[in-house]
């Protein structure tokens, strides 16, 4: 077979991975082979599990993310575009907080290039609820770009933009455990967004993910993990944050009261089916009060800090509140639905 010599190239890399962290160059070579379909299933599984067993390094995260970025179907986004996304996988089953936050932030005038997928840890992922909202998520780069232009926000469905991952998907499904691929979504925005509000399913991921985004050229980011276990800023308690700003990382803790918001019981943000979550989203856009609104206001305030619009959470909450109450966030949803409804690709 013509790919046998290239598969041979994986053997020393797998051995190195079992002994210690790979160099960035080694990891990039390995992930290129995997995404080209030139490594055998056993080799791909062996490498993934060797890395997982000892813990992934920042160089390995950065290498995998860079290879995915290089191979993705790219989207041209406005300057200052940001992504608001979580890793998923927290298993908490909440309402769609980051999705609603993205539209509130877009309604406030910050371009949002949102990268997402279907459900991972809940009954309703971003793509599931957006579909229920009348948005066609299975669109190509040109439609996403038009959506960004007309609505100030575009949704990039991960499988539409990362076709090379098809070679790895069967391996991931057979392994059935969390691997490096569970955190790559937020690191591989097809629009090359350089500002991120990113949630992680585990607290020990937020610092290395922040380091990775710095390595990949991000300008500003908040990496967050809520004390309630969510991959978002918690409305029910404190949230650990690693902030990337001016090329430096610093850790901080935020609390709803820092933003002038009340603490709500975690049960009040639990979600349901895509249809139920979409209805909660519609109600929020129409002015419904309560835990969901406050969670979105809090996350939007943080996103506005990352975007450089404000420096304090309380100021961000006021801008986010105006985005909802003025109807701007709702108009952003309607505009994306309009743009995407005329396309099937």
UniProtKB/Swiss-Prot annotation:
InterPro entries: Anthranilate_Pribosyl_Tfrase, Glycosyl_Trfase_fam3, Glycosyl_Trfase_fam3_N_dom, Glycosyl_Trfase_fam3_N_dom_sf, Nuc_phospho_transferase. Pathway: Amino-acid biosynthesis; L-tryptophan biosynthesis; L-tryptophan from chorismate: step 2/5. Anthranilate 1 binds at residues 86, 117. Binds 2 magnesium ions per monomer. Keywords: Amino-acid biosynthesis, Aromatic amino acid biosynthesis, Glycosyltransferase, Magnesium, Metal-binding, Transferase, Tryptophan biosynthesis. Pfam families: Glycos_trans_3N (PF02885), Glycos_transf_3 (PF00591). It comes from Jannaschia sp. (strain CCS1). Its EC number is 2.4.2.18. It catalyses: N-(5-phospho-beta-D-ribosyl)anthranilate + diphosphate = 5-phospho-alpha-D-ribose 1-diphosphate + anthranilate. This is Anthranilate phosphoribosyltransferase. Its cofactor is Mg(2+). The gene is trpD. GO terms for molecular function: anthranilate phosphoribosyltransferase activity; magnesium ion binding.
């Amino acid at each position: 077979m013509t790919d046998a010599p290239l598969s041979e190239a994986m053997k020393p890399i797998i051995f190195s991975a079992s002994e210690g962290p790979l160099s960035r160059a080694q990891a990039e070579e390995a992930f290129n082979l995997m995404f080209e379909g030139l490594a055998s299933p056993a080799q791909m599984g062996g490498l993934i599990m060797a890395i997982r067993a000892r813990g992934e390094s920042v160089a390995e995260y950065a290498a995998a993310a860079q290879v995915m970025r290089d191979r993705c179907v790219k989207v041209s986004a406005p300057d200052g575009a940001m992504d608001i996304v979580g890793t998923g996988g927290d298993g908490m089953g909440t309402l769609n907080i980051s999705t609603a936050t993205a539209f509130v932030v877009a309604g406030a005038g910050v371009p949002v290039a949102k990268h997402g997928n279907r459900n991972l840890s809940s009954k309703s992922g971003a793509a599931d609820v957006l579909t229920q909202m009348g948005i066609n998520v299975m669109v190509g780069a040109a439609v996403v770009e038009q959506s960004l232009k007309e609505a100030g926000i575009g949704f990039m469905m991960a499988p539409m933009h990362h076709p090379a991952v098809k070679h790895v998907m069967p391996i991931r499904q057979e392994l059935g455990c969390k691997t490096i691929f569970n955190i790559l979504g937020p690191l591989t925005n097809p629009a090359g967004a350089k500002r991120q509000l990113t949630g992680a399913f585990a607290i020990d991921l937020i610092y290395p993910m922040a380091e990775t985004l710095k390595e990949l050229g991000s300008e500003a980011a908040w990496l967050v993990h809520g004390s309630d276990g969510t991959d978002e800023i918690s409305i029910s308690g404190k949230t650990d944050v690693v902030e990337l700003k001016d090329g430096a990382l610093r850790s901080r803790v935020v609390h709803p009261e820092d933003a002038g918001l009340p603490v709500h019981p975690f049960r009040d943000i639990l979600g349901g089916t895509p249809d139920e979550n979409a209805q909660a989203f519609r109600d929020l856009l129409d002015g419904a009060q309560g835990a969901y609104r406050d969670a979105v206001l809090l996350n939007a305030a943080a996103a506005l800090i990352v975007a450089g619009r404000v420096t304090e959470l309380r100021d961000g909450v006021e801008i986010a509140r105006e985005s909802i109450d003025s109807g701007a966030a709702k108009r952003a949803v309607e505009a994306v639905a309009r743009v995407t409804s005329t396309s099937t690709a």
